């Protein structure tokens, strides 16, 4: 999965969680910049799992609070074949 594909999945997830038509967030901006709180972040992980087919398990977005960091975690999962 390319970073652009993952980024698109995250943006789509944010739109679904927040009920928005569009989201503007840079790869290095925190998810709070897009208006997500801790509950929204948990829901975002679930949305991204559904879109990408990845299983993040008990992953907490506070450990990766930007698209760049979240993609790094996804890369670890892909490397392990998750």
Region spans (language model):
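Phosphopantetheine-dependent thiolation modules in NRPS/PKS and related acyl-activating systems
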Residues: 2-34, 40-45, 50-82
């Amino acid at each position: 999965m390319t970073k652009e594909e993952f980024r698109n999945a995250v943006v789509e997830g944010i739109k679904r969680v927040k009920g928005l038509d569009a989201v503007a967030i840079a790869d290095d901006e925190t998810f709070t910049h897009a208006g997500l709180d801790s509950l929204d972040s948990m829901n975002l992980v679930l949305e991204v799992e559904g879109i990408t087919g990845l299983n993040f398990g008990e992953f907490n977005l506070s450990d990766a609070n930007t698209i760049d960091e979240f993609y790094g975690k996804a890369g670890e999962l892909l490397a392990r074949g998750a």
